[in-house]
Structure formats: structure tokens, C-alpha cells
Amino acid sequence: MRVAIMNKFYFILLTICFLGCSEESIPQDLPSSNSHPLESNSIPRNPLKNVYFGDTHVHTDLSFDAFLFGTRRTPDDAYYFGKGQKVKHAYGFNMQIKKPLDFMAVSDHAYYLGVLRHLSKSTSGDHTKFSKLLRETKTADDVFEVLAQTMRYLNQPSDKTIFDNKDVVRSSWQEVIDAAERHNQPGKFTTFIAYEYTSGSVFSGPNPDNLHRNVIYRSSSVPIEPYSRLDSRNPENLWSWMDKKRAEGMDSLAIPHNMNRSNGKMFKTTKWDDSRIDAQWAEQRLRNEPIVENSQVKGTSDTHPLLSPNDEWADFEILPSANERDLNGSYVRQALIKGLVMKEKLGFNPYQFGVIAASDTHNAAGSFGEANYWSKTGLLDNPAHRRGSVPLPEPAEEGSVYSDDASRYWGSLRVSWRLGRVKH
């Protein structure tokens, strides 16, 4: 495993070139999961490796929360931003990155994907007033009002709400797919079809447990709709679904994030039902989650001062509200140690993963520069004092990968894949 540490201070951005493959170790004729030719075949390779930068955690107006925040930028807008073009913030100013990214994934919430945008266009029915609120959201106060109305709908005793619309979810998922396909430029700008699985055993209240994952597809062979918390809140069921789809030629990996907000549940030493972890469970987790997102706008999940008392940088970018949650099982360094102990005592290690950083922007555009920091939450980003500050002169600018050609990012993230995105 080759690890690239890409920051001046302490935390790791995206590091992984699993197995750091030499040319001799890569079978050039290895078939892909859906038997399509590799996009990297015609792309020059650098035997000394290259460093690539990208963002695998981007939300657009298809995410229910981003739309509530007033974001009206689409997946296409997100990819335009990634390629260096200007896009508009919800408050009307331009957002633009200094240098184009090399790879990117729009990863909107599968949970009610596109439904809020769809409802905003409705002019009839029992929810007309709510639809009007969505359309007329212009200020931070409007956001708080529409959030309150949304929670009233979500907290209804009925299993069915105005948000349950599979047709809209499927058409929105197709929009995600189409945008990734339009903007994919092998060797120049690689896009991945993706979504966020937004789950937790406790979803509301003062201390919800964040068990969210971004699911990233290797190719354009993808299911007709994403798997969401409406299917199951148990991540183990997500892994089983991924295994099933992988057997059908739809290969993917999941990237957990915000372990710091998981209330100790992301890196437990037991299963979802609190039964004992076994080797089969460890293998399934590793197969589906070879990498975790340990730094983003909602703080670092690397470590905590109470877990690393001898590390003077352990308090860097700690999310204040995370201090109110259970630290044990919520941070990466501790999980790596737990995994080594489990390997020694039990013979298996479910936590031998790599790390990545990403933006988690809900503006369709990651904000990476201190001098022009626009934050992540649409209309809630203004006025400027709402955005707070970032202590680094150049805060975490997505992830970095060592690889030898520009479409092999996937293989650099995936312990068992070394061949990048494949053609459809």
C-alpha cells in the first residue's frame, strides 16, 4: 500500500494507492467487471506515478437538504465547477476553483433524491403551500421556515409522506448518471456515478448517529435506483446489496464519512445487532469499504485529544458538537489500532482501510481556499460571518491519489481494483 500525505500539518487527504502496483504486477488483459474495454488503454502512463486531485462528496439541488438550503445548482453545474468554470452560489456570487480537478463524483442523497425539487414545481394538491415555500426560499430565515415545515411532514405517523415518489427518485438518479457520462473525459477529467447512503440507527434528536456512506460505481453499469435508508438503515444490508449487484456486474465501493458524528457506532467491535463480529463480517466490510473519508467540512475524524493525548495536533479541526458524542468508535486512528488488536487476538481485521478527504459541499461546488471561502450550505452561508474560518492557509482541497495514468483513480482507491473506470 502506498500512502500520499498531502498536507502541511497533520491530517491526511486522500491517500491510497493500494498495493502501489508496478507495471509487471498489473495484468494488462484483465477483464473488467462488465467486459468493456478500459478507458485507460490509450492514455499515456507515467511509471513514476502522478498525483491527482478530486472530490468524491458533492451535493446538488437533487439532495433534499441542499435544495432546502436554497441551492439550485445541478449535477451538470457541479461538473462544470470541477472543470474550472464559474457557477453561481445561492446568493448570486461566483464560485470558481483555482485549478480544475482531475476526478469528481456528484454524490447526492439517495434518500428522497430529487423529490424536493419536484415538489417545488407543484401548483396543486394538499401541499401547495409547502411547494410555494420551496419556490420562494430566498433568505436564511426562509430556510429555517421551510426546514420546520419539512420536519412536520417527515414526522407524520404514516409511513407514506408527500416525499415518497419512486418515479422521481429514478428519474433523478438517471440525471445523476447522464451528467457523469456527459462530463467524463478519460485522461483529463474522470467522473464517477455515485450517491450518498444516509443512515443511522438514530436519525433525529440532539445526538443522531451518522452512519453515512458515499457509494461510488466503477463504471456506468449501475442499478435503476440507489439503495437508501428507506430500504434499510443497517449498513450491513447495504453491503449485502452491493455484493448482490457486484455479482450482476455493477461494481461499487462505499466510503463512510463523519465518523466523528457516529456516536461511537462507525467502528464498533460488534455488529449492528450487537452480536460478535466474525471473519465473514470483516471480509464483507473490507470488500465494500476499503477506504474512509476522515476529513471534510464537518470536521476531522482522524483522532481526538482524549484519544491521542500525546499528539499536540489532535484537536485540529475537531467539530465542537462531536464532543457531545461517544468518542470511542468514532475516530480513524483508534479504529486502525482496534483492527490490529483484533487481528492479533481473533485472526481478522475489519479496519485495514485507507483514507480520503472531500468537501461535502451542498453548493455543488467545494470551497477550498481561505481567501475566498464560501462554505457549504446555500443561503445559510451569508452573511460572511456565518462561514467561520479555517485555520489552514489552504484547507483540505479534496483527495489526492498517486497513479500512473489519469483514469486509474479507482484502482488507486480500491485494494482489489487497479484499472480505473471502464467504458460503457
Predicted region positions:
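Sec-dependent signal peptide recognition
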Residues: 6-14
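Long, low-complexity intrinsically disordered regions enriched in Ser/Thr, Asp/Glu, Pro/Gly
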Residues: 10, 22-24
